[in-house]
């Protein structure tokens, strides 16, 4: 029977000093012997997805105390990718994931906590905390801040629902006036919460549900809705129940590595492919799998992508569907239900809230249950009032979206596409693979062939696009933006948004060893591995080389023969210390922190985790 980890600092005569310090935090005699449960919050006023989290840790703490535990809250950092986008701030986004993982590990292990509740929400915070949870392998529950409401605007005589990507596209188009752009900007992000489409933050929060590490509705119920309060309170109660099962009954099925098994990772990736989630999820799931010592690789993702259909399309893949609509259709439990009916997931996996995923679906899938509380929960609707307050409204839809033929979530028979929403491409340009979000690609360009336009920074590519130097049929190739080459593997939301604003979104492609925001769409191929700075073939592409992309056949090739490629590689190697570096002089300050990240990071094909 495992002992409480916290006993090492709360019991024994030699720990009198430690107990004295615990008492100074508010602990009483009766508290020594209770489980100490860490609450990792990520409140910050910099990020709309986290601005409302300040007091929510105490909601969890109250329930932990009532259930017989001792709650201790701490905070970690959170970077807003949207605010960091388009300048050197984006270099820090992906590296912050490792710092978040480390900070959670440091706090939990330094203070010998017995269990963990992770309050996350946005892009790198959920993955960082997930990595930490799998390292620590103590009872853990995730509860996120929830998605933002979609913006609503009457714009150019149209009633639209919008998000931040719409504001970016509007601003880049010369056809919109300053007043029109300002109007769109003010409407795009009306409330607290993670951005309203199926971007990285919401994708990852949905995937914690699929992994079994968070409660039903975690990925979809709005940040503003009072129903989300129930998730925080239940997380506090449930974590104590998990603690008792592990420490008092020796039940290892409640541990993160038991819950997030290989089968659970396959389930999560299946959900991601079926809903056309962010390509960043590939990076983060690979990283988390390595932390949990789970044998889950790009090869597995490739196999899944060939058999999983697209059952759900959300902005930016389609303009009029946001997370509030996914929730009305049953959320991730509804999507898992359809995948289960199609025989595409394994429901024997464990969860933090039910013994198995099958048991969870029996209760929470709106197509399988008539439970009034469940049906009411999934009718939670937006309030339509700008706010930064959590749980500030209680609006409900009159009906659920149960239409699996034409609704937001489809069954396999009525899938948007029988081919998955994400694909792994291989070829002489990406020997270790690259990723494309096929759910956001127009059917007319699933195969594409064109000349490469070479750029060695995101900035130079953006300048070329905005100055009309990119023409129909060309492939914008941005290199030396990978984990090591950037360093930090910047997101390329601005180049993709500007291509769309210039009317090139369906007639051009973008290929990079960097990555894309969950808000990106179009023929955007990222994570090219090996990256340029690692000696990848992408560094050897020359201006005008023809690149052939074939998504149905999962291939990406540059039409250059092997003899020529060997000559180019030899020429590059002859540069000595100057090899595998951008020729273009980049105006980029690389700090010691970023240099340290670059020195230790691995390829995107391995999740860009550190090689230690």
UniProtKB/Swiss-Prot annotation:
It comes from the Bacteria. InterPro entries: Dihydro-acid_dehy_C (IPR042096), DihydroxyA_deHydtase (IPR004404), DiOHA_6PGluconate_deHydtase_CS (IPR020558), ILV_EDD_C (IPR056740), ILV_EDD_N (IPR000581), IlvD/EDD_N (IPR037237). Binds 1 [2Fe-2S] cluster per subunit. This cluster acts as a Lewis acid cofactor. The active site is at 517 (proton acceptor). It catalyses: (2R)-2,3-dihydroxy-3-methylbutanoate = 3-methyl-2-oxobutanoate + H2O; (2R,3R)-2,3-dihydroxy-3-methylpentanoate = (S)-3-methyl-2-oxopentanoate + H2O. [2Fe-2S] cluster binds at residues 122, 195. The modification N6-carboxylysine is found at residue 124. Pathway: Amino-acid biosynthesis; L-isoleucine biosynthesis; L-isoleucine from 2-oxobutanoate: step 3/4; Amino-acid biosynthesis; L-valine biosynthesis; L-valine from pyruvate: step 3/4. Homodimer. This is Dihydroxy-acid dehydratase. It comes from Bartonella tribocorum (strain CIP 105476 / IBS 506). The lineage of its organism: Bacteria, Pseudomonadati, Pseudomonadota, Alphaproteobacteria, Hyphomicrobiales.
């Amino acid at each position: 029977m495992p002992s409480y980890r916290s006993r090492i600092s709360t019991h024994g005569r030699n720990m009198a000093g430690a107990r004295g310090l615990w008492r100074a935090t508010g602990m009483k005699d009766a508290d020594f012997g209770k489980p100490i449960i860490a609450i990792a919050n990520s409140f910050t006023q910099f990020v709309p997805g986290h601005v409302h989290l300040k007091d929510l840790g105490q909601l969890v703490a109250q329930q932990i105390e009532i259930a017989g535990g001792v709650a201790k809250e701490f905070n970690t950092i959170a970077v807003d990718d949207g605010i960091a986008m388009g300048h050197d701030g984006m270099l820090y986004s992906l590296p912050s994931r490792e710092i978040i993982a480390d900070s959670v590990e440091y706090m939990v292990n330094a203070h010998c906590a017995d269990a963990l509740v992770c309050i996350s929400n946005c892009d790198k915070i959920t993955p960082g905390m997930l990595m930490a949870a799998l390292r620590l392998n103590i009872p853990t529950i995730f509860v996120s801040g929830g998605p933002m409401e979609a913006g609503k605007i009457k714009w150019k005589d149209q009633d639209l629902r919008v998000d931040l990507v719409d504001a970016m596209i509007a601003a880049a188009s010369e056809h919109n006036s300053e007043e029109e752009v300002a109007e769109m900007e003010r409407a795009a992000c009306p409330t607290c919460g993670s951005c309203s489409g199926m971007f990285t933050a919401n994708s990852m929060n949905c995937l914690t549900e699929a992994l079994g590490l968070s409660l039903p509705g975690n990925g979809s119920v709005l940040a503003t809705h009072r129903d989300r309060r129930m998730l925080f309170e239940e997380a506090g109660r449930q974590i104590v129940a998990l603690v008792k099962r592990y420490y008092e009954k020796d039940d290892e099925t409640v541990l993160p590595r038991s819950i997030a098994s290989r089968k659970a990772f396959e389930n999560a990736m299946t959900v991601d492919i079926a809903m056309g989630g962010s390509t960043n999820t590939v990076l983060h799931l690979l990283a988390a799998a390595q932390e949990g010592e789970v044998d889950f690789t790009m090869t597995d993702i490739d196999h899944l992508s060939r058999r999983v259909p697209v059952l759900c399309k959300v902005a930016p893949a389609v303009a009029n569907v946001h997370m509030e609509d996914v929730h009305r259709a049953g959320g991730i439990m509804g999507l898992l239900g359809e995948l289960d009916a199609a025989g595409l997931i394994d429901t024997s996996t464990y969860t933090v809230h039910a013994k198995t995923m099958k048991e969870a679906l029996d209760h929470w899938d709106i197509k399988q249950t008539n439970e009034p509380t469940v049906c009411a929960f999934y009718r939670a609707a937006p309030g339509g009032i700008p706010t930064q307050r959590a749980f500030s409204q209680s609006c409900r839809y009159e009906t659920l979206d149960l239409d699996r033929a034409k609704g937001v979530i489809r069954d396999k028979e009525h899938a948007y596409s029988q081919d998955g929403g994400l694909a792994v491409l291989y070829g002489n340009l990406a020997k270790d693979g690259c990723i494309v979000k096929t759910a956001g690609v127009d059917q007319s360009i699933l195969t594409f062939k064109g000349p490469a336009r070479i750029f060695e920074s995101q900035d130079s590519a953006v300048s070329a696009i905005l100055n009309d130097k990119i023409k129909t049929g060309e492939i914008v190739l941005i290199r030396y933006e990978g984990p090591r080459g950037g360093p930090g593997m910047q997101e390329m939301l601005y180049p993709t948004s500007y291509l769309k604003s210039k009317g090139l979104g369906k007639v051009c492609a973008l290929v990079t060893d960097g990555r894309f925001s969950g808000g990106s769409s179009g023929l955007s191929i990222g994570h090219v591995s090996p990256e340029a700075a690692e000696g990848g073939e992408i560094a050897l592409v020359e201006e005008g080389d023809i690149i052939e992309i074939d998504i149905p056949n999962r291939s990406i090739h540059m039409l250059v023969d092997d003899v020529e490629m060997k000559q180019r590689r030899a020429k590059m190697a002859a540069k000595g210390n100057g090899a595998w570096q951008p020729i273009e002089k980049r105006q980029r300050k690389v700090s010691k922190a970023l240099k340290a990240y670059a020195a230790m990071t691995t390829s995107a094909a391995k999740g860009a985790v550190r090689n230690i």
